C-alpha cells in the first residue's frame, strides 16, 4: 500500500449534506498532509452485506462510514475487525464533541453491545424525529400550532371535526413505530431505555410506558387522528401525503428536512420536537470506523478529526445536514439554523432516546406487523404487547447479547 495515499469509503450522496461536507474534509486533509485520498463511494447495501469479508481482506479501506448499532458496528467490533479508538479519542478530545447519548453508538463492549466499553466509531452528525406541521392548513381552520401534549390532541380533534385526518402515517415501514416509541419515551426513564436498548435488565412489556403508548395509538385510530387505512402505507408515501397537503401533520425524522425545504417551497411549514417529553426519538448518525487491517490508522484518525472541525461542520449545516458541532451563527438559512438550534438543545439535555427496532435484527419488521394488527383492530393492546415481547425476547436470545 502506497504511503502517499489513504483509502476512504462512504455511502452518502455527493449532493447531500454529509457528501458535501466530507468532500471538503478530504480536500483539507490532502492539503494538510500531502497524502492523496483514494475515495470510493459504495452503496449502503454493498457495505452492509459484505463488511466482514471486506475487512478481513487486503481490500479493506483505511477509514469508512459504517452503520451504528449492535447488529452492525457492534458485531464487527466483537469480531476484532475494527480498531479500538480509545487513544485517538484522548489525543483529539473527541469525547468533548461526541458525548452523552451521542457517544452511545460509538462505544461497544466485548459482546458488541453499544453504550459501554471501548470506542470503535466516531460520528459527526445526528438525527432526531420531530413533528412537522403544515402551517397553511392550521391557519385555514384557525388552529394553533401545539405547544403541549394537550394542545396536540385538541388540534387533532379540531382537524377531525373539519373532516381532515391530521396525521400522515404508515405502518408498512417506519413512521408509526417512531410515533409509538416517542409515546413510550414520554413515560420512560433512563433505566427502561438501558434495559430495552442495552439489555441491562428485563423490559416490563406490560408496564406503564409501553401500555400507554400502545393504548394511545389505538385511541388515536378510533378518534380518526390516524387513518385505519395506513397499514400498507410506506414511509415515502406518508412523507408525500404531508408534502402534497393531504395531511397537516407528520411525525418523522430530520432526514426529510432538506426535501421539505426544496419540495414544499410554496407551503408554509414548521416543526418542533414532540411536546411534554424528556426524551426524543433519535441518535447519532452513522460512524467513522478504522478497520483493524489498516496500515494508516494515524492518518485515518487525522481525517476523522477534520470531519469534526468547525469548517466542515458549518458546511454540513449550511448544506441542510445536522452537524453535532456547528455554530448556529455560521448557518445562513433561517430554517436550518432553527433545526440546528433545536438539535443542540436536545443534545444539551442528553435527550436522545434511540430507535425501537435496534435491539434485534428482525425487530423492525416484527414491530410493524404488531402495530398493523393494532391499527386495523385485529389485536388488542395486551396481545400486541405480548407479541412484541415474544419477538423481542427471541431476537435478543438469538443474538446472544444479554449477559
Which residue ranges define each predicted feature?
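Extracytoplasmic/periplasmic substrate-recognition and gating elements
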Residues: 4-7, 27-32, 36, 56-57, ...
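Extracytoplasmic "Venus flytrap"/periplasmic binding protein-like
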Residues: 28-105, 136-147, 241, 248-249, ...
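Glycine-centered hinge/linker elements that transmit conformational signals in sensory
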Residues: 156-158, 198-230
Amino acid at each position: 500500500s502506497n504511503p502517499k495515499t489513504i483509502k476512504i469509503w462512504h455511502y452518502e450522496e455527493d449532493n447531500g449534506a454529509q457528501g458535501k461536507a466530507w468532500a471538503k474534509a478530504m480536500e483539507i486533509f490532502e492539503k494538510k498532509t500531502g497524502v492523496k485520498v483514494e475515495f470510493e463511494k459504495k452503496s449502503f447495501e454493498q457495505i452492509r452485506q459484505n463488511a466482514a469479508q471486506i475487512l478481513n481482506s487486503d481490500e479493506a479501506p483505511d477509514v469508512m462510514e459504517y452503520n451504528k448499532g449492535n447488529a452492525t458496528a457492534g458485531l464487527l467490533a466483537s469480531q476484532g475487525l475494527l480498531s479500538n479508538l480509545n487513544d485517538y479519542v484522548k489525543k483529539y478530545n473527541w469525547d468533548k464533541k461526541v458525548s452523552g447519548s451521542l457517544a452511545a453508538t460509538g462505544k461497544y463492549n466485548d459482546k458488541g453491545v453499544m453504550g459501554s466499553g471501548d470506542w470503535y466509531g466516531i460520528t459527526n452528525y445526528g438525527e432526531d424525529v420531530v413533528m412537522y406541521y403544515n402551517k397553511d392548513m392550521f391557519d385555514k381552520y384557525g388552529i394553533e400550532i401545539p405547544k403541549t401534549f394537550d394542545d396536540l390532541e385538541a388540534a387533532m380533534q379540531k382537524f377531525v371535526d373539519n373532516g381532515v385526518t391530521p396525521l400522515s402515517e404508515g405502518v408498512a415501514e417506519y413512521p408509526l413505530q417512531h410515533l409509538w416509541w416517542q409515546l413510550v419515551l414520554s413515560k420512560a426513564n433512563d433505566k427502561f431505555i438501558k434495559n430495552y436498548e442495552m439489555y441491562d435488565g428485563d423490559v416490563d412489556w406490560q408496564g406503564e410506558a409501553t401500555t400507554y403508548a400502545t393504548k394511545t395509538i389505538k385511541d388515536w385510530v378510533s378518534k380518526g387522528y390516524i387513518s385505519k387505512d395506513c397499514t400498507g402505507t410506506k414511509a415515502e408515501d406518508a412523507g408525500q401525503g404531508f408534502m402534497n397537503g393531504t395531511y397537516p401533520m407528520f411525525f418523522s425524522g430530520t432526514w426529510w428536512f432538506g426535501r421539505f425545504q426544496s419540495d414544499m417551497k410554496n407551503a408554509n411549514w414548521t416543526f418542533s420536537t414532540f411536546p411534554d417529553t424528556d426524551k426524543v426519538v433519535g441518535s447519532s448518525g452513522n460512524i467513522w470506523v478504522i478497520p483493524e487491517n489498516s496500515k494508516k490508522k494515524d492518518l485515518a484518525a487525522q481525517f476523522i478529526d477534520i470531519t469534526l472541525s468547525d469548517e466542515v461542520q458549518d458546511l454540513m449545516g449550511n448544506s441542510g445536514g445536522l452537524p453535532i458541532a456547528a455554530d448556529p451563527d455560521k448557518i445562513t438559512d433561517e430554517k436550518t439554523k432553527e433545526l440546528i438550534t433545536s438539535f443542540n438543545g436536545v443534545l444539551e439535555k442528553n435527550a436522545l432516546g434511540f430507535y425501537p427496532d435496534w435491539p434485534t435484527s428482525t425487530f423492525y419488521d416484527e414491530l410493524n406487523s404488531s402495530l398493523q394488527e393494532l391499527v386495523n383492530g385485529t389485536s388488542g393492546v395486551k396481545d400486541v404487547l405480548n407479541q412484541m415481547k415474544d419477538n423481542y425476547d427471541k431476537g435478543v436470545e438469538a443474538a446472544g447479547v444479554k449477559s
